Curated annotation (Swiss-Prot):
Pfam families: Transgly. Belongs to the glycosyltransferase 51 family. This is Biosynthetic peptidoglycan transglycosylase. One of its GO terms (cellular component) is peptidoglycan-based cell wall. The chain crosses the membrane at residues 12-31. It comes from Pseudomonas syringae pv. syringae (strain B728a). It is an enzyme of class 2 (transferase). Gene3D superfamilies: Biosynthetic peptidoglycan transglycosylase-like. Its EC number is 2.4.99.28. It is a single-pass membrane protein.
Length: 236
């Protein structure tokens, strides 16, 4: 009886592993039709009695301003080009910060955020964290860094029901993602930790200070030169 149960569990895990590899491999080339986070936001709005229309327009990476690419890397994951999905130093710093009390600090890389937004529900359970790690490893193994950045910029939330760079550029600045200035991009990147509470187009003093810091980091990263070398170190 026990052996039969174990065999079924192993078989289910193997099917899940194979299926998830296939899905991630397909999404290496095919734009995701939607994300788990979009579904979650839509369902939440139904339960709240105020259904929302999701705003999202997929844009190829070369149609998105380099300013925005650098801004989100500067603000969210400065070791993006170097790591394989996990920033160990940031994780250790977040653990120490959280142990001291106060606000909870995250340490998710862009790759982890893509995994969470695409495939998973909100929460901090061990199961969800384990699945996030699994999908992050698959994405890092099967996608290029440019593809990870492209999917991130097209799936991240920038206001209530506003997903992706093009929708965000239109919503906040009445422009296209390709035309975002360094200042506009820095404000969009500055609100990413809490995009439903902070506004890129009507920034608080904190968001303005954070945007200024992000612009400094953008210059230090090297701008276009950084992007040109993004994939040169590794990938097949």
């Amino acid at each position: 009886m026990l052996q039969s149960i174990l065999r079924r569990i192993v078989k289910a895990l193997l099917w899940f592993a194979a299926g998830s590899v296939l899905v991630v491999l397909v999404l290496r080339w095919v734009p995701p039709p939607g994300t788990a986070l979009m579904v979650e936001r839509k369902v939440e709005s139904w339960f709240d009695g105020e259904p929302i229309d999701l705003q999202r327009d997929w844009e190829p990476l070369d149609k998105i301003s380099d300013n925005l690419k650098i801004a989100v890397i500067a603000g969210e994951d400065q070791k993006f080009a170097e790591h394989w999905g996990f920033d160990v130093d940031a994780i250790q710093a977040a653990i120490l910060h959280n142990e001291r009390g106060g606000s909870i600090r995250g340490a998710s890389t862009l790759s982890q955020q893509v995994s969470k937004n695409l495939f998973l529900w909100s929460g901090r359970s061990y199961l969800r964290k384990g699945l996030e790690a699994w999908f992050t490893m698959l994405i890092e193994l099967l996608w290029s860094k440019e593809r990870i950045l492209e999917v991130y910029l097209n799936s991240v939330e920038w206001d209530e029901g506003v997903f992706g760079a093009q929708a965000a550029a239109q919503h906040h600045f009445r422009t296209n993602a390709s035309a975002l200035s360094a200042q506009q991009a820095s404000y969009l990147a500055a609100v990413l930790p809490n995009p439903r509470q902070w506004s890129a187009s009507h920034p608080s003093s904190y968001v303005s200070r954070r945007a200024g810091w992000i612009r400094q980091q953008m210059r230090q990263l090297g701008g276009d030169e950084y992007l040109q070398g993004l994939n040169s170190s590794r990938r097949w």
